[in-house]
């Protein structure tokens, strides 16, 4: 009974997300959603002088903010995991 309720709730959440995505006219919905999920004080983008999550960067130039690293494969700032 608990599992079926959980699955029903998960299905409703998924339906809500898909419905919101289909109504969104912006083509950058996945990036917008990820930036809202992983937002870490992105309100001061120009003031801080570094690039936040998802911003394009050049590998080896240390342009990303602390706790972010420039991905050499995708060439955008991502969350730094580990040391």
Curated annotation (Swiss-Prot):
GO CC terms: extracellular region; host cell presynaptic membrane
Localization annotation: Secreted
PROSITE patterns in UniProt: HWTX_1
Positions annotated as propeptide: 22-48
Tissue spec. comment: Expressed by the venom gland.
Family: Belongs to the neurotoxin 10 (Hwtx-1) family. 15 (Hntx-3) subfamily.
Comment on protein domains: The presence of a 'disulfide through disulfide knot' structurally defines this protein as a knottin.
Protein's name in the database: Mu-theraphotoxin-Hhn2d
The organism of origin for this protein: Cyriopagopus hainanus
